[in-house]
Amino acid sequence: MRLNSTEISKLIKERIAQFEVFNQSYNEGSIISVSDGIIKINGLSNVMLGEMILLPNNEYAIALNIERDTVGAVVMGPYIHISEGAKVRCTGKILEVPVGDNFLGRVVNALGFPIDGKDSIQNDGFFPVEADAPGVIDRKSVNQPIQTGYKVIDSMIPIGRGQRELIIGDRQTGKTALAIDTIINQKQSGIKCIYVAIGQKLSTIINVVKKLEENNALFNTIIVVASASEAASLQYLAPYSGCAMAEFFRNKGEDSLIIYDDLSKHAVAYRQISLLLRRPPGREAFPGDIFYLHSRLLERASRVSMEYVQKITKNKITGKTGSITALPIIETQSGDVSAFVPTNVISITDGQIFLESNLFNSGIRPAVNPGISVSRVGSAAQTTIIKKLSSGIRTALAQYQELAAFSQFSSDLDDTTRKQLNHGQKITELLKQKQYSPISIAEQALILFVAENNFLDDISIDKITKFEKEILIYAHNYYFDLMEEINKIGDFNIVIKDKFIKLITEFKKNQF
């Protein structure tokens, strides 16, 4: 077989013409030090603050310090296999987490990977962990309530959809219990819940998951976990990841509730990272941007307008408003709310629910101090019937607490003072509530009506709990339609008032 030189030449030219040169440049550097999850990198000239940096073995770090010659980055996870001299490169992206409806009912880590031993999760896309909060024009006023199921909160410290309400108190005062009960109470409301556990013991988190399962509330909840045994970088990231998952529901025109348990441990994790990055420490050794750490997180919680939802979904969803309601938790030391992190978060949020260890230890659960607890925007969102019936409760409690303090110094009290003290004690007893037992709007309305209209005067304090339990059973058995109507419309009128009086009179005459 003879080879034709012309054909060979033609074939070579065709192959050369078809050859494509792929020229892809990378911004590459090398690790010069590794310690405590922090790496120092030399040679990254075009890195962005917060950018993901690709490490060996497909691990990632986030650039947090940009200096003249080096970049300080925090490794997202284990760092044992990382060594000095290893090559790293920029990705040009900020960190994103997977989001979607399929995450409901699952337990995931701070990066969105399932850790509950079940199947992998099919996501509906990725959202950035660091996102801008909606602007003033994109927001809508808070005018719809979130029912916690607690009489003392829904009546005196109401929470609205899109609000940020701080839960603050010493350890072991019922902060997490209050948050979990709020999630349990949302299983019929359609509000999607995200519980972010930061720096908690795994045994505590397992108990939370178990309680939500027992109360049929896990199907509506995403649990994001960065436990005490995990790296500080993941504890720092977890709240932002949870918020990104909540934004997925908000952008669809749905309401979501997110609980950060707790931001004190989040601040400690960030302090640890900052000190390892050699940032200058300030008050209580926290870095200078500790306020911004929490403000940029909590400002993402809001109620957005129909136009915002329409714009962000490119007209796929119209006529709906979305919201993120945030319940951050802060742990205080010996009731000191004037510490650095508590005062920061108090100034960012729209109110606070203060839990006192003295009240908790004396058997008042939830241990809410109504004197210094406040909701700055929730009253506009409060259900009409609860708003009308609870107006005198706070005043009566405030008078009772003032008189109770005064009566310790005087043994000779007049009849009016003694009557006010007795009434205050009965209201305090009536507002007590067991854990994992949230109650409906109608049940709250009936109990508040009893307290407001002096139907407790002839009942001794030790029988208040029994009276409350039995009157609710009686109401559901004989006035079921009335209770359903109140739950549906949430309004108060003369007809409902007359029916309440009839119900209470009949019950006290025949049953109690």
Curated annotation (Swiss-Prot):
InterPro entries tied to this protein: ATP_synth_asu-like_sf, ATP_synth_asu_C, ATP_synth_asu_C_sf, ATP_synth_F1_a_nt-bd_dom, ATP_synth_F1_asu, ATPase_a/bsu_AS, ATPase_F1/V1/A1_a/bsu_N, ATPase_F1/V1/A1_a/bsu_N_sf
The protein's matches in CDD domains, at most eight in alphabetical order, are given as: ATP-synt_F1_alpha_C (cd18113), ATP-synt_F1_alpha_N (cd18116), F1-ATPase_alpha_CD (cd01132)
Q: Please list the reactions this protein catalyses.
A: ATP + H2O + 4 H(+)(in) = ADP + phosphate + 5 H(+)(out)
The record's PROSITE patterns line, in alphabetical order, gives: ATPASE_ALPHA_BETA (PS00152)
Residues of the site described as Required for activity: 373
User: Can you list the GO cellular component terms from the UniProt entry?
Assistant: plasma membrane; proton-transporting ATP synthase complex
Give the top-level enzyme category: translocase
- GO MF annotation list: ADP binding; ATP binding; proton-transporting ATP synthase activity, rotational mechanism
Q: What is its EC number?
A: 7.1.2.2
Q: Does the keyword Cell membrane apply?
A: yes
Keyword field:
ATP synthesis, ATP-binding, Cell membrane, CF(1), Hydrogen ion transport, Ion transport, Membrane, Nucleotide-binding, Translocase, Transport
Subcellular location(s) of the protein: Cell membrane
Q: Fetch the PANTHER family from UniProt.
A: ATP SYNTHASE SUBUNIT ALPHA, MITOCHONDRIAL (PTHR48082:SF2)
> What is annotated about its quaternary structure and interactions?
F-type ATPases have 2 components, CF(1) - the catalytic core - and CF(0) - the membrane proton channel. CF(1) has five subunits: alpha(3), beta(3), gamma(1), delta(1), epsilon(1). CF(0) has three main subunits: a(1), b(2) and c(9-12). The alpha and beta chains form an alternating ring which encloses part of the gamma chain. CF(1) is attached to CF(0) by a central stalk formed by the gamma and epsilon chains, while a peripheral stalk is formed by the delta and b chains.
Q: Which NCBIfam families match?
A: atpA, PRK13343.1
Q: What does this protein do?
A: Produces ATP from ADP in the presence of a proton gradient across the membrane. The alpha chain is a regulatory subunit.
Q: What is this protein called?
A: ATP synthase subunit alpha
Task: List the source organism.
Answer: Buchnera aphidicola subsp. Acyrthosiphon pisum (strain Tuc7)
Please name the gene that encodes this protein.
Answer: atpA
